[in-house]
Amino acid sequence: MAKLRSATTTEGRKRAGARALWRATGMTDSDFGKPIIAVVNSFTQFVPGHVHLNQLSELMGETITAAGGVPKEFNTIAIDDGIAMGHGGMLYSLPSRDLIADSVEYMVNGHCADAMICISNCDKITPGMMLAALRLNIPVIFVSGGPMEAGKTKLANIDIKLDLVDAMVKGADESVSDADSDQVERSACPTCGSCSGMFTANSMNCLLEAIGLALPGNGTTLATHKDRKQLYVEAGARIVDLCREYYQKDNQEVLPRAIANKTAFMNAMVVDIAMGGSSNTVLHLLAAAQEAGVDFDMSHIDALSRKTPFLCKVAPATPEYHIEDVHRAGGMMAIVRELGKAGLVDMSVNHVAGSTMAELVKKWDATDPTNEAARKFYRAGPAGIRTTKAMSQECRWDEGDNDREHGCIRSVEHAFRQDGGLAVLSGNLAVDGCVVKSAGVVDDMLHFEGTAVVYESQDDSVEGILNDEVKAGDVVVIRYEGPKGGPGMQEMLYPTSYLKSKGLAEKCALITDGRFSGGTSGLSIGHVSPEAASGGAIAYVENGDKIIIDIATREITLALSDAELEARKQKQLARGKQAYKPLDRQRYVSSALKAYALLATSADKGAVRDLAKLEELS
């Protein structure tokens, strides 16, 4: 039987001081000996996806207490990528993932907590907590704050659904009137919750269901809906059960590394590809696999992408469907079910819910006419009322979406596309690979040949696009924005949004060693590895070079001979200490960001810390 970690601070006469401090937090004699559950919250008033998370604390605490645990809450930081977008604030977004992971480790190990409930929601917070959970390897359940309702308004007498990206595109489109732009802005983000499309936050919260660390409905039940209360209650009770399983029965199969094993990572990636998840998920799953000690890299993702169909097309790939529609169609359990029918995922894996994936999928099958609980659950829908209050409405669709031929979630036979929504490309421009969200690429752009227009920073690219330097047929190349070169690997949502506003989204490509928001669509290729700052070939591209992109063959090619590439390499090396650094870029880089850059690896490694370099320095 494993001993409670918290016994280190609660047992024996020599721990009188620690117990005295615990008593000052409200603990009593009856609490000592119970599992201490760290309620890892991320409430902040800066982020709509987190603005309501303080409303969950009391509920979670009451549930854990009733189940026989002792809840102790602390908070992490949370950066809103949408607000940090397009200025120096975005440099801090990806580095915050590691800071969050470290802060969770510090708090949990510093106080010897026995288990964790991770209340996350947005882009880097869920991955950061996931890294910590796999690093610590103690019982854990993730519960997100839930997705935002899709925005809705009427323009030109047409009812339309909206999200954050629409506000950005309309705001940059000079042909849109001030009144229409203002109307879209005011309608795009109507409630608390993570932004309403298949963007990074929702992608990660959905994948936690698929990898087995979050309960069904975690990724798709709206933040405003009362059904989330039951999700939180079940999670609070279940985490105490997991503590009993591990600490009293020595059942190590309930630990996160046992659940999120290689098979589970492969399952999650298949689901990710099938649902057209954000390309950032590749970055985060690679990083999480390293923390879990799982052999999972770009080659696995490439192989899976070639055989996984695209089953769920959601904004930003289409304006027709948002996350609320995915829930109506049966959520992640429905996608897993369709993939399972085709033998594309392993249904025997375990789950924090206490069953195999096969059992869980059957339990939550909303297509079963006799399964009233599942059918009701997946009909939870939006209320259309502006609010920041969680669990405040109980509207339901009149009926679910079980149309697997024409609906939001398709069967394999009726897939939107037989190759999936994410693809890994490689070639002389990206020897270690790069990633494209192919779900957002129109068929006419799956093969593209264009002329390079090179920028040394995102800021310069935005200025160039808005000043009409980019024309149809061009390939915008933005470099020195990788993990080390940025530093911080900024998202390029503004450049892609401005290409849309200029009518070039389906006429140009964009390539970067940075990354993209989950809200990006179009032929947007990121995570180019090695990055420019690490000597990658993207550093050698010059204006006017021909670049060939072929998603079907998974190739990306800079049309230069090996001899010319070598000549350009020597030209770069001749710059001495300035080699592989941007020309004339004016950017303040703080000591915190310099520390991040010192250990950052390229995107193909998940942009994690270079542990070999860390060992050299220690």
UniProtKB/Swiss-Prot annotation:
Its cofactor is [2Fe-2S] cluster; Mg(2+). GO terms for cellular component: cytosol. Keywords: 2Fe-2S, Amino-acid biosynthesis, Branched-chain amino acid biosynthesis, Iron, Iron-sulfur, Lyase, Magnesium, Metal-binding. Pathway: Amino-acid biosynthesis; L-isoleucine biosynthesis; L-isoleucine from 2-oxobutanoate: step 3/4; Amino-acid biosynthesis; L-valine biosynthesis; L-valine from pyruvate: step 3/4. The active site is at S517 (proton acceptor). The modification N6-carboxylysine is found at K124. It comes from the Bacteria. Mg(2+) binds at D81, D123, K124, E491. It catalyses: (2R)-2,3-dihydroxy-3-methylbutanoate = 3-methyl-2-oxobutanoate + H2O; (2R,3R)-2,3-dihydroxy-3-methylpentanoate = (S)-3-methyl-2-oxopentanoate + H2O. Its EC number is 4.2.1.9. Homodimer. Belongs to the IlvD/Edd family. This is Dihydroxy-acid dehydratase 1. It comes from Pseudoalteromonas translucida (strain TAC 125).
